[in-house]
Amino acid sequence: WYMVQSGLVNNVDVSHFRLSIHLLFAFIILSLILWNYFILNHDEKYEKNLINYLPEILLFLIFLQIVIGAFVSGMDAGKIYNSWPLMGNSYFPDDNNLLNLFKISAFSDPSLVQFIHRNLAYLISFIYLILIVIVYKKNINKLFKPINVLGLIILLQIILGILTVLTGAGIIIASLHQFSSILLISS
């Protein structure tokens, strides 16, 4: 009701902030269910250091990406800057100032939200690449399949994200992009 109520006052669109909170709670519930399942089926302990925290960092960034994706969806930000890899004619949206990126109002600006969503995807991909190199370098055989599945889902999500941008957030591609985020958080 909290989310829907925002669309009943002044305009018919729901608040992108409330939409993202609603979505985030759904993903937290799903993740807790999966986390408990995996903990019950896994009793191995390992030393915590920066490298071993990378999966948690990656998971946090994926959650953040889903929230920013809800902002993109709620603001129809996917319908602007329908080019990739550039946003129009430049890396940074030309309707904005770089300094605006560091203001809280950036989360209410469609072009900046799309910029953040794109760049967070690049960061997630980079951290994934670090993880896969570590897994293969340390020859952790039991993680080969899960890390490869994760990589395929990240690749699927990136391809669907690019297609979503190029199609101006066409409903079928955009819906597949949103659905594959469930696969991503579940992997």
Feature names for model-found ranges:
Residues 1-187:
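Polytopic transmembrane helical bundles with strong interfacial aromatic enrichment
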